[in-house]
Design a protein with these regions (language model features):
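Alpha-solenoid helical repeat scaffolds
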Residues: 38-39, 70-78, 108-112, 128, ...
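Short, conserved micro-motifs composed of acidic
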Residues: 47, 112, 119, 123-413
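Canonical positions in the second alpha-helix
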Residues: 60, 98-99, 132-133
Length: 416
């Protein structure tokens, strides 16, 4: 054989071997990188930093070979769970679909996919997936109520209620503004929870990927028009997350939710109190509702008579997810916590309780039949202590999350 031909042949074989080695090395490095990403993601997820965890799981998923279906399915599931927690609904739906495509074994992925589709107003596909899940888990409360919501929502949109919705541009910024609370003898102050860029906390939250929330206030001017909101004066806001506040009937005490940060432990919400002196609020003090330090306590609401503090918690003894609880407020302190039970609480999440001055309780739930996500509900307690719950329907509710109401005295006007 000609030496030149032999030499070229040897070089070609050597080149092919080198390419094969490089390909194997690339696959190996990619697999190792994916495992590192999963490990980091798990660490973030364990302490509730879902935004940071999602970034790691996304890298891990993209670095996992398509033929490795089991790992692709598991990583798609983890990514979907992060997106669900931080309310990235469309991305969550896509990730759950990937998990199911790769035969992830947990059928809950089908339920969560249906919920995400319903939250996007895709009632047809949501209904199909709720029914598929009910074939696997007959009688499941969340799927049963979700299915019913998909059937009711289109009818509610066709036959609307008498509520009129009007946007207040001056009260809304480019970021999230939510959970309003009216204050003052003439309801001329409105406290809101906001994540506007100007808030005091300069840190980006690993939970949400945006700045932590603060409490701001807007006041009415001489013409009765709302002014631009501004940060509450005094020591109310901090480097941590504050929001979802309410007031005692005498206006002397504010109850608020605060989430502190710890790089080594899960994030738990707690309820704090602040007292009013002249025009400013004091530095908040933690309100110990229970000795349980592994549960969250949030979204306080004081009953109109000042005798009860309603709040949201995932403490043991609930019905699943977040439940609404209440605790007696007395001159000697606080009583024991009581779960409101059915028909208010469900296996889903009940949140953002608030009262109308006439004693009606309003709250949001994603476990009762609704249009999608959190819907607003009204609950009235009769003389026997039984609650009657009613969905506020469209246009008060939408396929997205609807929550956080405050009422302007006895008149039929509210901010949400």
């Amino acid at each position: 054989m000609n030496w030149f031909i032999l030499s070229n042949k040897l070089r070609m074989q050597h080149g092919l071997a080198l390419l094969a080695t490089l390909a194997c090395l690339t696959i190996l490095l990619s697999a190792c990188g994916a495992e590192t990403n999963v490990k980091k993601g798990d660490q973030f997820y364990a302490i509730g930093e879902y935004f940071d965890a999602s970034a790691e799981y996304k890298k891990a998923y993209s670095r996992t070979a398509i033929k490795d279906k089991a790992k692709r399915g598991e990583r798609a599931w983890k990514l979907a769970e992060c997106y669900r927690h931080i309310n990235y609904t469309a991305k969550a739906a896509g990730a759950y679909q990937n998990a199911l495509r790769y035969h992830y074994p947990d059928s809950t992925a089908l339920l969560y996919l249906a919920q995400a589709q319903q939250k996007q107003g895709d009632y047809k596909n949501a209904l199909k997936n709720y029914e598929a899940y009910l074939e696997l888990v007959p009688g499941d409360q969340l799927a049963t109520n979700g299915r019913l919501g998909c059937l009711l929502a289109p009818m509610w949109k066709k036959k609307t209620t008498l509520y009129t919705i009007k946007k207040e541009p001056v009260l809304n910024g480019r970021r999230s503004d939510y959970s309003p609370a009216l204050f003052g003898d003439e309801w001329d102050q409105l406290y809101i929870t906001t994540t506007r860029p100007q808030i005091e906390s300069g840190e980006i939250s690993g939970i949400t990927g945006i700045k932590s929330a603060d409490i701001w206030v807007s006041k009415k001017d001489e013409k009765g028009k709302w002014e631009q909101p501004a940060s509450v004066e005094g020591g109310l806001n901090s480097e941590y997350e504050e929001g979802a506040c309410c007031f005692s009937p005498d206006g002397r005490t504010m109850y608020l939710t605060r989430c502190t940060f710890d790089p080594d432990y899960p994030r738990y919400a707690e309820i704090y109190t602040s007292t009013r002196s002249d025009a400013s609020w004091s530095t908040p003090q933690r309100l110990q509702i229970s000795k349980d330090t592994l549960s969250s306590y949030a979204h306080p609401a004081v009953s109109p008579d000042g005798k009860w503090l309603y709040f949201v918690s995932d403490m043991p003894g609930g019905m699943g997810g977040l439940d609404i609880w209440r605790i007696a407020l007395t001159e000697h302190g606080m009583g024991g916590a009581e779960n409101l039970g059915e028909p208010i609480n469900t296996a889903g999440n009940e949140m953002f309780p608030t009262f109308r001055p006439n004693g009606e309780l309003y709250f949001s739930s994603d476990g009762l039949p609704g249009m999608g996500g959190l819907d607003l509900f009204k609950a009235v307690c009769d003389s026997t202590g039984q609650w009657k719950v009613e969905n506020l329907k469209y246009p008060m509710n939408s396929n997205g999350d609807d929550f956080g109401m405050t009422f302007e005295g006895q008149i039929g006007r509210a901010h949400v």
